[in-house]
Amino acid sequence: MDKQPVFFCVCSQKGGVGKSTFTILLASWLHYALGRDVLVVDCDAPQWSIVAQRERELDVLERNDRYKLMMVRLFKRTGRKIWPVVRSTPDEGLQAARAYLAAGDREADFVLLD
């Protein structure tokens, strides 16, 4: 990990205020609109709503050729693949991010902890 990422933590003790939605929108804007490398760490145990949403998205892509084509076009237009999501717990979020980035050629400009 040569880059030193900027860490953002989106948190609130109140549920249902849009933390995960904000995290997803921020990650997508940074990644696709600004071309920055982003890692999202979903620490929202036990829901892991960002991980669950990503799994639903991948399931739809596997079953629907129209959406698959749209994703391929997005990748070609932006030159960016989908941003990664790591499942963790609140206590282990920073360690999970660092472990993910330390494995292989992975780098991030921004790490978003939800």
Protein language model regions, located:
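Walker A (P-loop) phosphate-binding motif
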Residues: M1-R36
